[in-house]
Amino acid sequence: MRKKLDPIHPGEILLEEFLDPMSISQYRLAKDISVPARRINEIAHGKRSISANTALRLSKYFGTTERFWMNLQTRYDLEVEKDRLGSRLDDEVQRLATG
């Protein structure tokens, strides 16, 4: 049986696909987008979610869409919750019978 991989936090994407390749420090990003450095650090370490406010700022800074960042966060949140619920969801919720 294949082992399920852990969901990828948006902070990992921010670090590995944006900050590291562009040689941008977390501190510089925070200053450039006018947010506390702690916010970026917590996102980068998977301790904080990307809010709509942060998504708007990141999208403007990196030339992406705000949906890109929000979709990363939403997908992560769903995967974490799916893992947490496990088979309980099937036991607790039945599909609505139609027609």
List each model region and its residues:
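Short, basic-rich loop-to-helix N-cap that marks the start of a DNA-contacting helix
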Residues: 47-60
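The DNA-recognition helices of helix-turn-helix-type DNA-binding domains
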Residues: 36, 47, 62, 73-76
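A short, Lys/Arg-rich alpha-helix, primarily the initiator
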Residues: 1-24, 71
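Short alpha-helical DNA-recognition segment
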Residues: 24-42
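The alpha-helix within a helix-turn-helix
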Residues: 19, 30, 59
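Short, charged recognition helix plus adjacent turn
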Residues: 70-99
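Peripheral/terminal regions associated with large enzymatic or DNA-binding modules
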Residues: 5-7, 60, 66-68
